[in-house]
Amino acid sequence: MAGAKEIRSKIASIKSTQKITSAMEKVAVSKMRKAQMRMAASRPYAERIRQVIGHLANANPEYRHPFMIERPVKRAGYIVVSSDRGLCGGLNTNLFKALVKDMNVNREQGVEIDLCVIGSKGATFFRIFGGNVVAAISHLGEEPSINDLIGSVKVMLDAYLDGRIDRLSVVSNKFVNTMTQTPTVEQLVPLVATPDQELKHHWDYLYEPDAKELLDGLMVRYVESQVYQAVVENNAAEQAARMIAMKNATDNAGDLISELQLIYNKARQAAITQEISEIVGGAAAV
């Protein structure tokens, strides 16, 4: 029965692991719902700023903010939003693949790369992969604050205003639904015009202190809000991916327990059969 004892020990060990993964799945579900609420709450703010920027830009065509001016790209910047923890399937791996692919396209065109990394997984990746990381921040927690991001974002915006980079993009995972998280690379500056930016009303507004100063402030706030939106959405995607990964681990543990239980029963049956055969053989000899 030595084999049966070993199998019984394995079953107990897997059951213990199954309890842990099941608990982690439930925790991820709770955190995902909270992250979804933060994600939904942050969207209207960024959308409204975008609308006001569009109105200001169209109403004051004589002033072009630097964030709205296209220029030849010699150096590009990326703000990379990754997670601080693992056990979330291929979430970070898929994100890094999409980023590296985009970086390679730029490098083939002679464009150099600067990186701002959010999340410890991104920092670890670029320590191994290599890359010019000019700013980094990690351990933002489950409820990130936009104030925690301002310093790192400012480093990249100052680089753009000083002409050290000519384009800035944010790389993060989009939360499509519980089962789908899509890695995306979105251009932040120069600001890309969108169809919904067209004015539906041509009303005149009075701006205080003036339209130029207001636009200057709003452009920075808009970029900060977009990065914050990327962080909270990536957090929701992380929790969804972790929930799915832990569910799969729990299900796989259940399948493995069933297989081992069957092997254990067969081993036990074989041992009993062997003992009966020995008893019968001994009785026949007598």
UniProtKB/Swiss-Prot annotation:
InterPro entries reported in the protein's UniProt record: ATP_synth_F1_ATPase_gsu (IPR035968), ATP_synth_F1_gsu (IPR000131), ATP_synth_F1_gsu_CS (IPR023632)
One Pfam family linked to the record: ATP-synt
GO cellular component terms, semicolon-separated: plasma membrane; proton-transporting ATP synthase complex
Keyword Lipid metabolism attributed: no
GO biological process: proton motive force-driven plasma membrane ATP synthesis
Membrane topology: Peripheral membrane protein
Disulfide bonds: none
Single Gene Ontology MF annotation: proton-transporting ATP synthase activity, rotational mechanism
Listed Gene3D superfamilies: 3.40.1380.10, ATP synthase, gamma subunit, helix hairpin domain (1.10.287.80)
Keyword terms of this UniProt record: ATP synthesis, Cell inner membrane, Cell membrane, CF(1), Hydrogen ion transport, Ion transport, Membrane, Transport
Cell compartment(s), UniProt: Cell inner membrane
Functional summary from the UniProt entry: Produces ATP from ADP in the presence of a proton gradient across the membrane. The gamma chain is believed to be important in regulating ATPase activity and the flow of protons through the CF(0) complex.
Family per record: Belongs to the ATPase gamma chain family.
Assembly, per entry: F-type ATPases have 2 components, CF(1) - the catalytic core - and CF(0) - the membrane proton channel. CF(1) has five subunits: alpha(3), beta(3), gamma(1), delta(1), epsilon(1). CF(0) has three main subunits: a, b and c.
Protein name: ATP synthase gamma chain
Gene for this chain: atpG
